[in-house]
A protein has these predicted regions:
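Membrane-interface interhelical connector segments
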Residues: 313-324
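Alpha-helical transmembrane segments of multi-pass membrane proteins
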Residues: 90-105, 129-146, 169-177, 325-337, ...
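Membrane-core helix-loop-helix motifs of multi-pass transport proteins
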Residues: 123-218
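Hydrophobic transmembrane alpha-helices of multi-pass small-molecule transporters
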Residues: 1-58, 66, 181-185, 189-313
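Membrane-embedded helical hairpins/re-entrant loop segments and their flanking transmembrane helices
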Residues: 74-93, 314
Length: 350
C-alpha cells in the first residue's frame, strides 16, 4: 500500500508542477515529509537527512565558479571568436556552432544558458549564410546538451553524483559519465553531417559567403577567468584519468582519493572573488537554484521510496515485464514527457 502511495506522490508532484508552474522539487519535499513522518513513522530529522547534501554541495560549488565566466562575458566572447574563425568555410558552420556550444557548455555554462546566448547568434548566421534554421537549431541544441554532459559540467556532475549515491564506485561513475558524454558528442556529429553533406541545403552552403567583423579581444578579467576555468577542468579530470590508467600507483591513488570537484571549485571561486573577476551577487544569482531544488527535492522523495521498498518493487517489475533492450527506450519516453533532472534520480535508484 505504501509503495502505491509513494508512486502516486511522485506522479502527483510532476502533475502539480506542470499545472501550477511551481518547482516540482517543492512538492516532492512536501510529499516526502507527509509520507515519511505520518505514513512510515520516520522522524523529521530522518526525512531531512534524506536531502542529498553531497549532490547539492557539488552542483552549487561548481556552478558558482563557472558563473563568473557567464557574468563577466567570457563565454559570450569565446563564442564570437570560435564562430568568427569559421567565416571562410561556411559549409562547416553547423559544426562550428555545435563545437562552440559544446565547449562553452563544457566550461560550465550549462544547457539553458548556452541556448540563451547562442540561439540569437545562430539565428543571425542562418539569415546571413542561408544555413537551414533546423540545422542551426539542432547544432545549438546538440552542442549545449553534449557540453553539459561533460564530466565536470552541470549534467555530468549530476550523473556522477547520482551514480555514486546509488552505490557505484567513483571510478566507474566517472567512466559511465564519460560514456554518456561521448555518446552525446558522436551521435549529433553523425546527424549534423548527414544534413550538411547529404541534403541540398547543406551542399548549397558551400558556395555561400558571409561577412563577420573581428570580435574584440578578451580583457584582463576574461583572460584570467578562461585560464582558471581550464586549470580547474585539468585538475579535476587529471586525477581520475591517471588513476584509471595507473590503478596500482599508490601516489596517484592517494591524490585521487583526496580530490573532490566541489571543494576544488570552492577554492577557485574564492580565487575569482579575490581577483575581482565578477560581481559576487550576480554570480550567486546565476546558480541554477531551480534545478538544485528539483533534483534534491525529488531525491528526498526517492529516498522515502527506497525506505518503503518501492524502488525494489519497481525494479523487480521492470526486470520481469520489460526486455532489457527496451528499458532505455521506456525511460527515454518517460524523460521525453517529463524533466530530465526529474527522471535521473529515479533511473539511478532503479
Amino acid at each position: 500500500m505504501m509503495s502505491l502511495l509513494v508512486v502516486a506522490a511522485i506522479v502527483a508532484a510532476v502533475a502539480l508542477g506542470y499545472k501550477t508552474k511551481i518547482n516540482i522539487g517543492l512538492f516532492a519535499i512536501a510529499f516526502a515529509y507527509l509520507l515519511g513522518c505520518f505514513g512510515m513513522g520516520l522522524s523529521p530529522s530522518e526525512v531531512i537527512g534524506m536531502w542529498p547534501l553531497k549532490i547539492f554541495f557539488v552542483i552549487f560549488s561548481v556552478c558558482l565558479f563557472y558563473s563568473f565566466a557567464t557574468v563577466n562575458g567570457t563565454l559570450e566572447k569565446l563564442a564570437e571568436h570560435l564562430i568568427y574563425h569559421c567565416r571562410k568555410m561556411p559549409q562547416l558552420l553547423p559544426f562550428a556552432v555545435f563545437f562552440t556550444a559544446t565547449v562553452i557548455a563544457a566550461m560550465g555554462a550549462g544547457y539553458y544558458t548556452v541556448l540563451a546566448f547562442m540561439a540569437p547568434i545562430t539565428l543571425l548566421l542562418c539569415q546571413r549564410t542561408g544555413m537551414s534554421l533546423i540545422v542551426g537549431g539542432m547544432a545549438v541544441n546538440y552542442g549545449a546538451l553534449s557540453g553539459a554532459n561533460f564530466m565536470s559540467s552541470q549534467s555530468g556532475i549530476i550523473f556522477r553524483g547520482l551514480m555514486t549515491n546509488a552505490g557505484i564506485s567513483d571510478n566507474d561513475a566517472f567512466i559511465n559519465a564519460t560514456g554518456i558524454f561521448l555518446s552525446t558528442l558522436v551521435i549529433p556529429l553523425l546527424v549534423i553531417g548527414a544534413f550538411v553533406f547529404l541534403t541540398r541545403e547543406g551542399r548549397a552552403m558551400k558556395a555561400s559567403v558571409f561577412e563577420a567583423s573581428a570580435p574584440a579581444t578578451l580583457n584582463r578579467e576574461q583572460k584570467i577567468t578562461l585560464g582558471l576555468t581550464l586549470a580547474m577542468m585539468a585538475i579535476v579530470l587529471a586525477a581520475p584519468i591517471a588513476h584509471i590508467l595507473l590503478p596500482a600507483n599508490g601516489t596517484i591513488a592517494f591524490i585521487n582519493s583526496k580530490m573532490d570537484i566541489g571543494l576544488i571549485a570552492s577554492i577557485f571561486s574564492v580565487i575569482a572573488l579575490l581577483l575581482k573577476l565578477g560581481d559576487e551577487r550576480k554570480a550567486m544569482a546565476s546558480v541554477p537554484w531551480g534545478t538544485l531544488i528539483m533534483i534534491c527535492g525529488v531525491g528526498m522523495l526517492i529516498s522515502v521510496a527506497i525506505k518503503a521498498g518501492t524502488i525494489d518493487v519497481l525494479a523487480s517489475w521492470i526486470g520481469g515485464s520489460i526486455p532489457p533492450i527496451l528499458v532505455p527506450v521506456v525511460f527515454g519516453v518517460v524523460a521525453a514527457v517529463s524533466y530530465t533532472h526529474l527522471t535521473l534520480p529515479t533511473i539511478c535508484s532503479v
